[in-house]
Structures are given as structure tokens and as C-alpha cells.
Amino acid sequence: MATDLEFMEFVAEQIENAGIITFRKMFGEYALYSNGKVVALVCDNKLFVKPTIKGREFIGIITEGFAYPGAKPSFLIEEKLEDREWLSELIRITEKALPEPKPKKKRKKKN
């Protein structure tokens, strides 16, 4: 089941105070960006946050899940989805802990 745009917009609104929040549709699901870094995936109307040590410490008792078959485990956020302040802080922590995205290589022109 693909994620509804309405759910994706709800998640983005919940974390709007975490930084510059954007999302991009990919294969019927969404990648969630904070300040240019992919911090989470939204699949099947569920939020999967990239795991980090600091994020694990912040959450405490975690629930892990897989965003799609073959994916690495992520933090599955369900109960705290309504808590804007808590969720925004988790996204800030995650974004700070992740490395900067690699610059895209320029394509060579065909002659």
C-alpha cells in the first residue's frame, strides 16, 4: 500500500520546526529530508527514521521496522507521531548525526 499524500503532509507539518523540511516521492513512497539530508522514509503510512546512536538514546525504548523488503532496520515511530515537539527534536538529532550528502557528480556531455 502506497503512502497517502495527506499522511506525508501531516508528518511534514509535525516536524516543520526541525529545519528545512522537504519530501520527495519515490516508488509510491516518500523520502523525508531535513536541511538536505534524508532523515526518514515514509512507507505504507508509517514513519521510519534513520537509526543513529543519539537518536536511540533520545527515544529510549525503540521499535525497529523495515520500510520495505530488503531495507535496513529503522526506528518505527508510531506512538509519538502526534507529539510535534518530541518528533521535531528526534529529526534534529538525526539530521545532526548523519553525514553530509555526497555531492552529485556532473554528467559528461555526449558529443
Regions picked out by a protein language model, each given a short descriptive name:
Residues M1-N111:
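Charge-dense, helix-prone N-terminal extensions
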